[in-house]
């Protein structure tokens, strides 16, 4: 279900402060975050966030196409190893 327009996008409060601090310092460092549920805002474009996937932080460089999406969409939590190979086809 989509969030109501009148509520606006959800972003954890500490995230705005961290992004502003990095942007004002001028250094392009990875901002470690655990908030996968936060929406990517236009002021985050050009910054790199380390989004936690449950095991480690995955670096995500924010571009304009990502605005409006959630951080969690860009850091997969599950590893896909593929389906099991067909044993008959493997023997030939």
Swiss-Prot record:
rRNA-binding recorded as keyword: yes
Gene Ontology molecular functions: rRNA binding; structural constituent of ribosome
Domain of life: Bacteria
Pfam families: Ribosomal_S19
Keywords in alphabetical order: Ribonucleoprotein, Ribosomal protein, RNA-binding, rRNA-binding
SUPFAM superfamilies for the chain: Ribosomal protein S19
One BP annotation, GO: translation
Entry's Gene Ontology cellular component terms: cytoplasm; small ribosomal subunit
Entry-linked InterPro entries: Ribosomal_uS19, Ribosomal_uS19_bac-type, Ribosomal_uS19_CS, Ribosomal_uS19_SF
Gene3D superfamilies (alphabetical): 30s Ribosomal Protein S19, Chain A
Function: Protein S19 forms a complex with S13 that binds strongly to the 16S ribosomal RNA.
Family listed: Belongs to the universal ribosomal protein uS19 family.
Name under which the protein is recorded: Small ribosomal subunit protein uS19
Organism: Bartonella quintana (strain Toulouse)
């Amino acid at each position: 279900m989509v969030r109501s327009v009148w509520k606006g996008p959800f972003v954890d409060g500490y995230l705005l402060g961290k992004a502003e601090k990095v942007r004002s310092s001028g250094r392009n460092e990875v901002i470690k975050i655990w908030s996968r549920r936060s929406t990517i805002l236009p002021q985050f474009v050009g910054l790199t966030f380390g989004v936690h996937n449950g095991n480690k932080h995955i670096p995500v460089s924010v571009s304009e196409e990502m605005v409006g999406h959630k951080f969690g969409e860009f850091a997969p939590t599950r590893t896909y190893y593929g389906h099991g190979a067909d044993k008959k086809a493997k023997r030939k």
